[in-house]
């Protein structure tokens, strides 16, 4: 069994309608993928006192936290996905995408350092973007991307 080093798991976003131009979120400290299914109550009088359910709609969302860099839309830094220097998206670009209501392509998964290069892809909207800057603390932001349509395993 290969236990994944969480440092290798990243969120990548493309805003040009091309899932081939994905960029990792800059200076990320956490990444999370949540999937859920609604259940439809199908209990009948003959269920013997036990609730019965049928599968309903599925949904998913990504969330993450990162340090804030306000120097521009992107920054050149070591990309944990590729293991080499690359262009990473900053909170400034994410703000623009949120404000415009832009649908983005996403990928959640492991890159060059991962054990199996497994990833999940789909389309999403930025549904939440918050920034925090406490006294003598590192400025951070949190982002939630809510999926629209299917999440695919790649």
What are these regions (language model features)?
Residues 2-70, 119-144:
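Solvent-exposed edge beta-strands and adjacent loop segments
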Residues 76-123:
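Short, acidic/charged, Gly/Pro-enriched secondary-structure junctions
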Residues 108, 145-147:
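Hydrophobic residues in beta-strands and at strand termini
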Residues 148-152:
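Hydrophobic lipid-interacting interfaces of membrane-associated proteins
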């Amino acid at each position: 069994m290969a236990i994944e080093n969480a440092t290798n798991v990243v969120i990548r976003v493309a805003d040009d309608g091309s899932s081939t131009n994905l960029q990792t979120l800059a200076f990320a400290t956490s990444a999370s993928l949540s999937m859920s299914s609604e259940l439809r109550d199908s209990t009948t009088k003959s269920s013997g006192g036990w609730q019965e359910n049928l599968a309903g709609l599925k949904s998913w969302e990504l969330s993450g936290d990162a340090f804030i860099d306000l120097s521009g839309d992107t920054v050149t830094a070591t990309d944990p996905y590729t293991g080499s220097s690359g262009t990473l998206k900053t909170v400034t670009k994410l703000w623009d995408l949120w404000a415009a209501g832009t649908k983005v392509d996403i990928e959640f998964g492991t890159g060059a350092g991962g054990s199996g290069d497994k990833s999940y892809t789909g389309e999403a909207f930025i549904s939440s973007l918050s920034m925090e800057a406490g006294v003598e603390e590192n400025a951070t932001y949190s982002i939630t991307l809510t999926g629209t349509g299917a999440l695919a395993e790649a």
